[in-house]
Structure formats: structure tokens, C-alpha cells
């Protein structure tokens, strides 16, 4: 799925941070880009700016909350009806835990309910996005290469322990598990799914720029190279690209502990249920 042909692209969380970089990238290549974001004011402004800067592209904005099935489903349907196809979907919208994690607080006299918005957006929102993307991609005629590509934004916090934000880390571990587990069933329909696991990239997801002052920052350009690699090569699916420094490293899944474990997983797969 190269860039020579204009594609219909959706970017969730496409109005800021990593999503904005993705929106800019696809607009610069002359694609039809639909930006989904909860911030209506900035999203509409960005769509207008990108349209002016890249007249060969079509850039639109729709206010959309990925944690709402009804809202997101309506947004996907609108794009499909307007364009007739959906080729690339960036399941990118995400939030951080913001402050101390509510997963465990041993200072409380009485336990309070954990704040789970990070799951609603980062994991449930990605599940919703993937389901809708695959539904509309599957309506396309099957070609030799691809019916469509889904790229999910995870994090290297989904690869390593991240004690300061355990719920955020859990949501990103979940995204990685979703990508790896859906690759085979989606491949049967000519759809690819991959994930990005970026290291520290300076974005507005952080509560303050002070957070980054002592960090090693990964350039946004490295992440965009990872995106371009997945777009260019439809043979890649179920892959997680760790984005770190100037490197894009495809991280393989864990090896099976033993032959029995592999056999059991293979049996589950052959049965088609668990």
C-alpha cells in the first residue's frame, strides 16, 4: 500500500501531538485525511491549515470521542459514505493518567474507585476503532496486496514496567496484545494491523513541558518513518515497532516457554474459540 495512489485515511486524536504529526504526514502526501478529535476548535483550525498548505490533499475534521461507540460509529459511517472507502486508520487517540495513579493508594482511609478514563480512551477506544475500521475495509474488493491497514498507537510503556503510571501501561500492554492477536484473523480478509510503541516524544499528553527536561527525546520524524514503513509494506502485520531515538525496531512476540504451550495455543487457534 504505497503512497502513489490517494488513500482515504482516518486519524483518531489527529488534532494534536502524535496524531497531528500523522495528519500532517498523510496530508503532505496528498491523501484524503479525516481528523477525529475531541477538541472541535483546534481540530477544525488544523484541518483548514493543512488544506491550505496541501491543496492536493483533502483534509476534513469531525469532533469525535473514541470512548463513545455511537459517536465513533457515526463518524466512520460519515467518512465511508462521503469517500466510498477507508484505506488507512490510525487508532491513535490517547490520554495519560494525569498525576498520581489511582490504581493503588495505600494512604486512603477508605478505598476510592480507580479513575479508568485511561482504559476508556486508550484501550476501549482502540477496540472500537479497530472494529469499525475492519468493517469498512472489508467492504472493499480483495486485491493482491491489501484491503486496508490499521496502525495502533501503543507505547514503550506497553513493553516495559512503568510503575509511575500502571493503568496507562496496562492500557498500552492491551493495545499490543490486541494487535498481535488480531493479525491472523484480519489477514484472512486482506487487512493488516500493526502497532507503534514510541519512547518519549514531546507532546501535549504530558501535564507540563517540565516533564521532558531531563529526558532523552525521540524525534517525531522517527515515528513517522515507522508509519511510512508499515504503509509501504503490506507483508507486515501483527508487528510492534518500537520507536526510539533515530531507530525503528520491530519487536517480536515472546517465545513460547515450551512445546506444550505452543501446542495448546495452536489447538485454540484451530478450534476457533477459547
Predicted regions mapped to residue ranges:
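Amphipathic alpha-helical dimer-interface segment in Rossmann-like NAD(P)H-dependent oxidoreductases
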Residues: 77, 81, 120-144, 183-184
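The beta1-alpha1 cofactor-binding region of Rossmann-like NAD(H)/NADP(H)-dependent oxidoreductases
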Residues: 40-41, 63-75
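C-terminal helical subdomain
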Residues: 195, 211-259, 270
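Active-site-adjacent segment of SDR/Rossmann-fold oxidoreductases
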Residues: 29, 160, 169, 181-191, ...
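Conserved mid-core segment of classical short-chain dehydrogenase/reductases
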Residues: 96-116, 141-145, 164-167
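Residue(s) in the substrate-gating loop at a strand-loop-helix junction
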Residues: 155
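Catalytic Tyr-X3-Lys loop
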Residues: 95, 107-130, 151, 175
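Canonical Rossmann dinucleotide-binding motif of NAD(H)/NADP(H)-dependent dehydrogenases/reductases
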Residues: 2-34
Amino acid at each position: 500500500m504505497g503512497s502513489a495512489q490517494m488513500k482515504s485515511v482516518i486519524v483518531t486524536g489527529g488534532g494534536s501531538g502524535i496524531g497531528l504529526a500523522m495528519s500532517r504526514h498523510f496530508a503532505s502526501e496528498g491523501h484524503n485525511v479525516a481528523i477525529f478529535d475531541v477538541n472541535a476548535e483546534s481540530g477544525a483550525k488544523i484541518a483548514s491549515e493543512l488544506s491550505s498548505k496541501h491543496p492536493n490533499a483533502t483534509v476534513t475534521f469531525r469532533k469525535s470521542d473514541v470512548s463513545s461507540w455511537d459517536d465513533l460509529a457515526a463518524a466512520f459511517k460519515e467518512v465511508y459514505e462521503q469517500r466510498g472507502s477507508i484505506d488507512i486508520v490510525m487508532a491513535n487517540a490517547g490520554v495519560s493518567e494525569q498525576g498520581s495513579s489511582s490504581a493503588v493508594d495505600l494512604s486512603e482511609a477508605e478505598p476510592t474507585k480507580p479513575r479508568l478514563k485511561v482504559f476508556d480512551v486508550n484501550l476501549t477506544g482502540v477496540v472500537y476503532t479497530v472494529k469499525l475500521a475492519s468493517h469498512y475495509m472489508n467492504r472493499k474488493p480483495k486485491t493482491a496486496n491489501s484491503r486496508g491497514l490499521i496502525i495502533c498507537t501503543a507505547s514503550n510503556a506497553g513493553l516495559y514496567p512503568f510503575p509511575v503510571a500502571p493503568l496507562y501501561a496496562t492500557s498500552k500492554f492491551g493495545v499490543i496484545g490486541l494487535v498481535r492477536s488480531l493479525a491472523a484473523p484480519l489477514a484472512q480478509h486482506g487487512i493488516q494491523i500493526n502497532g507503534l510503541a514510541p519512547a518519549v516524544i514531546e507532546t501535549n499528553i504530558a501535564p507540563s513541558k517540565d516533564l521532558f527536561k531531563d529526558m532523552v527525546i525521540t524525534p517525531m520524524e522517527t515515528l513517522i518513518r515507522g508509519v511510512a514503513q508499515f504503509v509501504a509494506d503490506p507483508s507486515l502485520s501483527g508487528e510492534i515497532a518500537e520507536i526510539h531515538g533515530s531507530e525503528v525496531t520491530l519487536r517480536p512476540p515472546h517465545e513460547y516457554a515450551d512445546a506444550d504451550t505452543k501446542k495448546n495455543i495452536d489447538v485454540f487457534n484451530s478450534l476457533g474459540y477459547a
